[in-house]
From Swiss-Prot:
Name by which UniProt lists this protein: Large ribosomal subunit protein bL33B
The family this protein is said to belong to: Belongs to the bacterial ribosomal protein bL33 family.
Gene3D superfamilies per record: Ribosomal protein L33 (2.20.28.120)
GO biological process: translation
Molecular-function GO term, any one: structural constituent of ribosome
Domain of life of the organism encoding this protein: Bacteria
Pfam families for the chain: Ribosomal_L33
InterPro entries according to UniProt: Ribosomal_bL33, Ribosomal_bL33_sf, Ribosomal_zn-bd
Keywords, alphabetical: Ribonucleoprotein, Ribosomal protein
Gene Ontology cellular component terms for the protein in this record: cytoplasm; ribonucleoprotein complex; ribosome
SUPFAM superfamilies assigned to the protein according to its UniProt record, in alphabetical order: Zn-binding ribosomal proteins
Amino acid sequence: MTAKKVALACSVCGQRNYFVPENPKRTERLTLKKFCKHCGRVTVHQETK
C-alpha cells in the first residue's frame, strides 16, 4: 500500500512544488528550504493540508 502524500508549498508564491510521504508520527508541519521554479530561488516550503 502506498503512503499518503502531502504537498510542500512555497511561502513566497504559494505554489505546491514538492510532494513528500506523510509521516503519522510527526505532529508539526514540515518546513524545508527548497528551490522554487516559479520564484527562481531557494525559499522556505511548508507542508500544506
